[in-house]
Structure formats: C-alpha cells, structure tokens
A protein has these predicted regions:
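Extracellular glycan-modifying ectodomains
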Residues: 1-342
Length: 342
C-alpha cells in the first residue's frame, strides 16, 4: 500500500507570476520613439533637398545609418535595389523586366535592323553580341531553387531571329556564359558589371568568330604591348545606390584583378567599329566601378579585343542616327540583352 503523500503547507506555496502584458503606456512609448526617429530623419531629408548628401554631412550620416539598419537587421534594400541571398544585390529594374512589370520600351532593335540595311549597301557587316543580365545567370541568388538553365524572356528568341532574318550576325552569349559560370564568376555580387574573367572570355569568343568569318580583318602578327596587373577593390555601384555615403560598410568590398594593356589605342581609321555602353567602357573608364578614379586603367573590352585581333579598333558609344561608316568592313555592337529585348 502506497504511503499517503505529506500535506502541503499553504504558507509555503510557490507564487507563479502572471505572464507579462504589453501595457498601453509601453505601447505609447514605442510609438513615440518610432515617431521621433522618423521626425529626425525627415528633418535631415528636407535639408538634403537643398544640398547633396556629400555636402550635407548630417543628412548623409542619417541616411547611411538608417540603410545599415535596414540591410543588416531587416535584410531590406530600397526602392531601386533589392537584397538577395549571400550578399547579392539586384536592381529593381532588372527584376521588373523578368517579371514583365512596367518598363520603358526602346528603339534599339528597330535601329539595328535599319543600320544593317545601311551597312549592307556599303558592303559592310553588322555583328551584334548580346550579353545576358545578372539575374538571368544567377536567379538562385534572388529566389532559391534548382535552375537547369538561364532565365529568359520569351521575346528574346523572336527578337534574335528577326535580327538574323535581316542579315545581322548575332552572337547570343547567354548559354555560353551559363556554362562558364561553373568555372568563373560572371558578375559581381554588389556591382552591375561583369567580372574581368567573363569579359575576357567573351573577347576570346568574339576574336575566334571574327577570325573565322572575317579572316582578312584580323592580324596574324602579335602586337607589341606592355601589360600590367592592377589589383582593385570596390564596394560596387549597387551598394552605392543603397548608401552613397559609406557603401563599403554595408557589405564590404569586392576585389578584381585587371590586366592593363598599353600599346593598343583606338583608331578612327580602323575598318572595324566597336559600339558599346558601360559593358565596353568598364575597366577603361576611371569613373566606373573598379576604375580607380584617377587615370584610365586601359583594361576594358575594347583593349582586350584589339589585343587579341592584333589591331586597333574604332571605338564608339552606342549607335546614333548620324554615325558614318565610310570604309568600314565590320561593325560590332556589344549590347546587354536588356537593351535588345527590354
């Protein structure tokens, strides 16, 4: 028979406190603190309307501090840049393009067809090199999942086919770069530009294509050049769009090794024209990412391609209506796919 349990002394009972409650007073204190933070931020933002962030130290500090909290604590960007996984940043415009959100149309595709007709009358060839965007090659950094290939718009195949029907030679580098990403990184995590390794891979592919289809335009002699390796660190232009004041504090810097080449200069008399925007100018323009801000590093696409072809190129911005192509034999357009198919 089990012994009877001892009697409980009422004077020795344990007091269990009730669960804490969020009182009305505490709620008001939180609201007051939040309103105060917003008010201080608004004051500095109003001041920033009349001066830039760089000249308005207080506004710049407040913006930088608030963005640091949003990025580090809440994993949030701003209206222009979204945070992905593993420190990757993506421009909102690039996301909008792939989800068919509102975007601005352009006349690039129609302009290329017109340009091809002009060049054909002059017995010159138009060659378009299309480069995919960051999100097309690294979708898992924004939305986790297993991807068997690059993310494309349905319009891309149709637009490229129309260019080929117009007699334009098209190099769509999307699939090639998708395979190349297993060996090298194609784009930076915090910068919108391609890496020097990806740029060099495309220059090699284009050099091979030109030598096969236009052998007379490439030189068989090795040019005399002076090559120097430049080690550069940069926070990235996407980080600067989040925090212009102190971008490196958000996610740190990324590194790039540039091959600066002296001895291949642009030549307006060259039979080969190379058109391009930032894809072409990055690593040549000191004001762009990893450019150093001082003198031109001379490590961009035009320099690399000219070295491989063994001749100087007529380097220009994107095609304009009044451009002349007298005595030109080959016109190359280096374009982001987002410009070709917005």
């Amino acid at each position: 028979m089990k012994p009877a349990p001892p009697k409980i002394d009422p004077t020795k009972r344990t007091f269990v406190p009730p669960p804490p409650e969020f009182s009305l007073k505490a709620a008001r204190n939180v609201i007051h603190a939040f309103v105060l933070v917003l008010a201080v931020t608004l004051v500095f933002e109003v001041a920033a309307w009349f001066t830039t962030s760089r000249s308005n130290l207080a506004a710049g500090c407040v913006r930088s501090g608030m963005q640091w909290v949003l990025t580090q604590a809440l994993n949030e960007g701003n209206k222009d840049v979204q945070l992905g996984r593993e420190g990757w940043l993506f421009a909102q415009a690039e996301i909008n393009r792939l989800v068919h959100a509102k975007h601005d149309a352009n006349e690039v595709h129609a302009g290329l067809i017109k340009l091809a007709a002009r060049l054909k009358a002059q017995e010159a060839q138009l060659l378009v090199v299309a480069i995919p965007g960051r999100l097309a090659l690294y979708p898992e950094q924004l939305r986790p999942g297993q991807y068997g290939g690059p993310v494309r718009l349905k319009d891309e195949a149709e637009k490229i086919a129309a260019l080929k029907e117009a007699g334009i030679d098209v190099l769509d580098m999307t699939d090639a770069l998708w395979e190349f990403r297993d060996r090298e990184q194609i784009f930076f995590a915090q910068d919108s530009h391609w890496t020097p390794e990806a740029m060099k891979a495309i220059a090699l592919a284009l050099n091979k294509h030109v030598r096969e289809k236009f052998p007379r335009l490439a030189s068989t002699e090795t040019p005399i050049i002076n090559a120097t390796i430049l080690e550069r660190d940069d926070a990235g232009d996407l980080s600067r769009r989040l925090d212009l004041f102190r971008p490196s504090r958000l996610l740190g810097d990324e590194a790039a090794d540039l091959i600066s080449i002296q001895g291949i200069e642009p030549d307006a008399k060259s039979p080969i024209v190379l058109h391009g925007g930032e894809l072409m100018r990055v690593y040549d323009d000191p004001t762009l990412s990893f450019g150093g801000g001082d003198k031109p590093p001379k490590a961009g696409f035009a320099t690399q391609l000219g070295t491989l072809l063994g001749r100087s190129l007529d380097v220009r911005d994107l095609p304009q209506a009044g451009d002349a192509y007298e005595d030109k034999k080959l016109v190359i357009c280096l374009l982001p796919m987002a410009e070709l198919v917005p």
